[in-house]
Amino acid sequence: MKKYLNLNVFTAAIQRLESLYNAGHKVVVSFSGGKDSTVCLELCIIAATRAKKLPVDVVMRDEEIMFPGTFEYCERVAKRPEVRFHWLVAHQPIINIFNRESPYFWVMDPALPKEQWVRQPPSYAESIPEKHIGALITKERFPTEEGKITYAVTGLRVEESPN
């Protein structure tokens, strides 16, 4: 049963995030450099600032093929003082939307010389052994205090949501 609050969406989102920070939980923003994840990041920065819990943990999976402007934007975000940015490189196959003859693209393929990659990750990027997206936000990578939970904040538009 839905229970409507007497709040707008912005205020409700900030209050919910702030309550997570105040309770000592770990909050990690899943970031792509797109509009949805940027909104989530900005909401978390506001909430973490109010709760005095900066910097905000941010994780991004480098997919190698990015528009140059998106790559540059992600680099700027990574340098923000209110952000603790985890730029991860998971050498894994992803769906190749650019070539119908080859359904998968191997991200920063370790079998190739680095010079053959579409672009190089930044020097501070961390290569991870895991080959699946579920490994990006784990208790091992983002440890919490005893009894606390790690929450992943992911931007997803209502039209794209299964529920």
Question: Which sequence ranges carry the predicted segments?
Answer:
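ATP-dependent adenylation/nucleotidyltransferase module used to activate substrates
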Residues: 1-163
